[in-house]
Amino acid sequence: MKFKNVAEELEFSQKRYKIKNDIEKLFIEKKYINYETNLVEDIKEDYLKNLQFKDSGVVKVIGDDGRISILSRDITTNLLNKLIPNWDLNSKAKLFYYGKIFKKDNNKIKEIRQMGVECIGLETIDSDKEMIDLIDSIMKNYRNKYIIEIGTSEYLKGILSEFYLDEVEYNFIINLINKKNKEDLKKYMKKFEKTPSREALENIIDMRGSIEEVLIKVEKYYTNQKMKKGLEELKEINSYINNEKIDSENIICDLSITSSLNYYSGLMFKTYYEEANKEIIKGGRYDIDSDGYGDIIPAIGFSVEIDEILRNLYKKGNI
């Protein structure tokens, strides 16, 4: 963000500090503890590099001895790389963090402030509900009109599991869904005519609305166990939203969310302020197979773009 003068820049910095403290106070009230991660990661310790970060946007640092390190590009990954090797299945942690991540963009290094929470080792549905509560509390603290977009990775992954797709086919379908290209998706799926979940996939783009509306829409389509698991998660969340008096006007359910689909293992969410196209909060469930033998550690979390909150408030004259 460009400033007219030093006073304006200092004011922006002070307001950023206040927002950070407000959110930190909320996390502490919910019994989260602060955890600090490193700015520099050893690439050999990256347990999740094959899941979420195949892009070329990472910033590499080459030492005098030729050893390659990476400037932190995601605090969650950095945090897990440090904690999971020593984790036992009875451990539990509610953590919050504040730090910087770095991404390469058009040969420039972009520095991004990131704040967030991770809930690791705790009961799945309870931590899902707590995430929704925290997200809603943060968003409504700054604006009345906002969107919390909720989905579940399990529904779409369940659909796709029926097709036995190769990588090219999989990526082509995901790309069509991302572009909301229903017409070409239907044409492409004709070759899978006998697959039970074909019709659900052809109509996945239309599975958007309130959680109640979406749950009604999916009733007429084939569902396998994985798809049902995702829908049951949404029912639980919908019941929680109604009971806790979270304003359902701000909630949109979208079963066609595909971002980092292979990384997530359940609830997914992202938030926006009205008339803004950049995410404020994003995250979801990413249960971890800690040893490769099926011992699963439940985990869910989200990150908050504090500077994006500030930019949005300044743009609207709300701050």
Features from the language model and the residues they span:
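Auxiliary tRNA-acceptor-end handling modules of aminoacyl-tRNA synthetases
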Residues: 1-12
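Positively charged, Gly/Ser-enriched RNA/tRNA-binding surfaces
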Residues: 12-31, 35, 42-44, 57, ...
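Polyanion/phosphate-binding surface patch
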Residues: 38-69
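Acidic, His- and aromatic-enriched active-site or binding-groove loops in soluble protein domains
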Residues: 57-63, 165-187
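A short alpha->loop->secondary-structure connector
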Residues: 90-91, 142, 166-167
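Short, conserved phosphate-binding/catalytic loop or strand-edge motifs used
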Residues: 111-115, 151-158
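Short, surface-exposed recognition loops or helix-turn segments adjacent to catalytic cores
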Residues: 145-156, 173, 252-256
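A short acidic (Asp/Glu
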Residues: 157-162, 264
